[in-house]
Design a protein with these regions (language model features):
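Catalytic cores of the polymerase beta-like nucleotidyltransferase superfamily
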Residues: 1-443
Length: 443
């Protein structure tokens, strides 16, 4: 599009939003977004831009395919994050467009000549590490509670006191209930994948939103654990450390969701039992399932939440297990068919164990279980099945095959343990309190 005068007003194009912010932070990778001031949709279409905006005029550049939006204002006319109407015209100024944005760090623009336009002090807030709202209209959009928490998780910035007050106002308004569960999950998932996911939980907790969206997680804060197992004592603090460990290791989203879910049952322990949490795994599974269903969590994360909640304690003590119990654990994780599920479980357990103060190094149970899986997979299950089928009655063939394959894998595990005596529990190490229950698959 030609950037010249149109009528009485010149058409001006500005780079805006995240790419300007990240440029000032010395970060690369943000998509570039543009605002066009002084133009009409017809002018952009005539210049080859393709309209893609459903609610307001947004166009794709004919060559770069970057998004160009007409400068616009917005007005609240209903409830929820969708209750807005937008107004775009050649008369809308850049200042008006920037004023509708959420945070000062996102309300900067770069002119075509390179000049930074920063009417709300975004650059200063970047230097200070502060998330600050642009205007009181910030409190009109409940989705901004999640956005602020997500930016806190990305940059580890503090929330300005006045902005935190507006977050509480949004929570008190009841409008958070208007956000669809799928959208809540999408924002939470993005926050979990940021470098400092604990900051997201902290911001949501401080403004009162955590108990609304993640009540199972909110219940963990202030719940004590045995100091010999958890020097940080507070279960919520431990969760925060484990999530940040997962981020530092760049673990995938299902792993991080498994970490989020692993100790949920401790929030349901009666106060009279503190700091002990006997049987919390079963409660954790129940609460993880409830949380996953409410947020409509995708299946891979839902499976991880259930798996880690149920088995993390057993994995930590795996070197004290007998071969039969090890095989039960591998079967519960469906590791023989889907080894990536075992990887998810082990990585989440690593976060649980090595995020503790003073811990570090390798997570020994992971190497142990992967070696055990290799030993079990070394069995030629097809050959064992053929032999069992040949000697079994037709009506009982399936059961005979299952028993024969299990027996062969148990033999392989016993031989593996016998040939690697140093892998087992040290003398005097007690067995885990409960033996894993046999399950065909899943957890």
């Amino acid at each position: 599009m030609k950037r010249n005068a149109s009528g009485a007003q010149a058409v001006q194009i500005y780079r805006v939003g995240g790419s300007v912010r990240d440029e000032l932070l010395g970060r690369a990778g943000s998509d570039r977004d543009w605002v066009v001031v002084g133009a009409t949709p017809e002018m952009l279409i005539a210049s080859g831009y393709r309209p893609v905006g459903r609610d307001f005029p947004v166009f794709l550049h004919p060559e770069t395919h970057e998004e160009y939006a007409l400068a616009r204002t917005e007005r609240k006319h209903g409830t929820g994050y969708r209750g807005f109407e937008f107004f775009a015209s050649p008369e809308v100024t850049l200042l008006q467009d920037l004023e509708r944005r959420d945070l000062t760090i996102n309300a900067m623009a770069r002119a075509e000549d390179g000049v930074l336009i920063d009417p709300f002090g975004g650059a200063a807030d970047l230097r200070a590490g502060v998330l600050r709202h642009v205007s009181p209209a910030f409190a009109e959009d409940p989705l901004r509670v999640l956005r602020v928490a997500r930016f806190a998780a990305r940059f580890a910035f503090d929330v300005a006191p006045a902005t935190e007050s507006l977050l509480r106002t949004l929570v008190a308004s009841g409008e958070l209930a208007t956000i669809a569960p799928e959208r809540v999950w999408r924002e939470l998932a993005t926050g979990l994948m940021e470098p400092h996911p604990s900051r997201m939980l902290s911001v949501l907790r401080e403004c009162g939103a955590l108990v609304l969206w993640l009540p199972e997680v909110a219940a963990l804060y202030g719940v004590p654990q045995r100091i010999r197992d958890h020097p940080e004592i507070d279960t919520g603090v431990h969760l925060s450390r484990a999530l940040d460990y997962a981020a530092a290791k760049a673990f995938a989203l299902p792993v991080r969701y498994g970490v989020l879910a692993h100790d949920l049952g401790k929030g349901a322990t009666p106060r009279r039992a503190w700091p002990n949490h006997s049987g919390h795994e079963a409660q954790s599974v129940r609460l993880a399932e409830r949380m996953s269903a409410r947020l409509k969590v995708p299946q891979d994360c839902r499976d991880a939440g259930r798996l880690v909640a149920r088995w993390h304690g057993v994995v930590h003590a795996v070197r004290a297990l007998r071969p039969a119990a090890i095989l039960d654990l591998l079967s519960a994780a469906d590791a023989l068919r889907r080894p990536e599920r075992l990887d998810t479980l082990l990585e989440a357990c690593e976060c649980d164990a090595l995020s503790l103060p003073g811990r570090g190094g390798d997570y020994a149970p992971a190497r142990y279980l992967r070696d055990a899986l290799a030993a079990a997979k070394g069995v030629d299950a097809a050959a064992v099945a053929r032999k069992a089928k040949a000697s079994a009655k037709p009506s009982g063939a399936a059961d005979a095959i299952a028993k024969a394959v299990r027996a062969a894998r148990l033999k392989a595990l016993r031989e593996w343990r016998k040939s690697n005596p140093g892998l087992g529990a040290k003398p005097g190490t007690p067995p885990p309190a409960s033996r894993p229950r046999r399950r065909a698959s899943g957890a």
